[in-house]
Amino acid sequence: HQIGTFYVKENRSDPKSRVIGIGFARYIARKPKGPPVFFLPGGPGGSYIDSVPPQFKQSGGPLLAEELLGRCDLVFFDLRGYSEHGSFLKDRAFKPKSAPPNATLQYRVREFKRFAQEVVERYRRTVVDLRGYSVLECVEDVNEVRKKFGYQKIVLRGQSFGSQWSFGYLKKYPEAVER
């Protein structure tokens, strides 16, 4: 098996974009009986990279992975910006205020918006280009790896946000999806 990092432009629409790393793991079947399965985690922040064989069940690895091991290639992704095996966005300078126990929904929404605006403003003063952190960029990450490994068609298995990521891929590259 392989565990490593692949490198992509942070923002593919910017020719001067910096390069970021994204972690992956690939398990190659000796005699595959079907197309590879790409496992896309939930998140943001989910990862399957450290829950790889033989500890799938013990570590809370993705459903079906253990059953598929050896039957087809398995490819596990980290989400860009949340990869211990690549680039990791860390913003520990801001700690949101704890909401009072009787806080209204409006208060919580207002506090979340304030939090999000402050974090975005802080990133604007760094080398990070937040325009590169979108579902569309994640879709392109999957497609680059699919092509790099020489897969014509893939099967997508997404959990939580990974399902949205899968739908985005299916919409943009239907010809590359087996199911």
What function would you assign to each model-found segment?
Residues 1-21, 25-179:
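Gly/Pro-rich cap/lid or specificity-loop segments adjacent to the active site
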